């Protein structure tokens, strides 16, 4: 961090790879952060950012005014350049999207940089055409987890024998789990 707090430089963790095996670089991070600057979802976080650039293996973020909370605001998905417009962009997380004989799923990324075990090797995904279908799948135990946009125009609300869990995050999330067996 510069003395005036207007420039922050970050060195990417070494050994981090995308799920396709390619390395995470400062250039890849800068591309994702610059795309986030113009994204309706993340642009408010970048209100005080005047420049994001990659050079010499570092990402430098320049601010119009000092902001000690900048690192927390940069908690956004970093995706591989060229895949950002894809419905399934390539990332560095513990799981990646794929399809197999059983259908669409999130598969465990064996090269995940944290190296920690994951709760499941495969997480099956299920599509639903509307909120009623989502609630039906959840209440009939076809799916065990749903996410909901509680500030959307038609938030999903589930009732009955379910459990709500709170988790610290910089992004508002809601997870609902079935707690009874069918």
Stretches found by the model and what they are:
Residues 66-124, 129-133:
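Gly/Pro-rich hinge or "lid" segments in bacterial periplasmic/extracellular proteins
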Residues 98-105, 124-181:
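Extracellular/periplasmic solute-recognition and catalytic clefts
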Residues 10-12, 18, 54, 63, ...:
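Hydrophobic residues in beta-strands and at strand termini
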Residues 16-22, 112-116, 181-182:
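Short helix-loop capping/hinge motifs at secondary-structure junctions, enriched
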Residues 32-35, 65, 147-153:
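Beta->alpha turn/N-cap motifs
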Residues 48-52, 58, 93-96, 161-168:
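A structural signal for short loop-to-beta-strand junctions that line the ligand-binding cleft
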Residues 7, 11, 17, 41-84:
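Surface-exposed binding/hinge segments that line
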Residues 1-42, 60, 137-140:
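Aromatic- and charge-enriched surface segment that lines or borders ligand/interaction sites
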């Amino acid at each position: 961090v510069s003395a005036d707090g207007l420039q922050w430089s970050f060195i990417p963790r070494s050994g981090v790879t995308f799920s396709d095996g390619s390395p995470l670089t400062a250039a890849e991070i800068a591309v994702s952060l610059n795309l986030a600057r113009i994204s309706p979802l993340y642009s408010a976080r970048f209100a005080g950012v005047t420049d994001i650039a990659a050079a010499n293996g570092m990402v430098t973020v320049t601010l119009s005014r000092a902001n000690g909370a900048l690192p927390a605001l940069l908690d956004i998905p970093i995706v591989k350049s060229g895949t950002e417009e894809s419905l399934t962009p390539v990332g560095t997380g513990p799981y990646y999207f794929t399809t197999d004989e059983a259908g669409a799923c999130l598969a465990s990324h064996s090269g995940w940089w944290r190296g920690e075990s994951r709760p499941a090797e495969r997480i099956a995904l299920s599509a639903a055409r509307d909120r009623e279908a989502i609630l039906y799948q959840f209440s009939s135990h076809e799916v065990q987890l749903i996410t909901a946009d509680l500030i959307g125009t038609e938030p999903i609300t589930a009732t009955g024998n379910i459990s709500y869990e709170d988790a610290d995050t910089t992004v508002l999330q809601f997870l609902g789990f079935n707690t009874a067996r069918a």
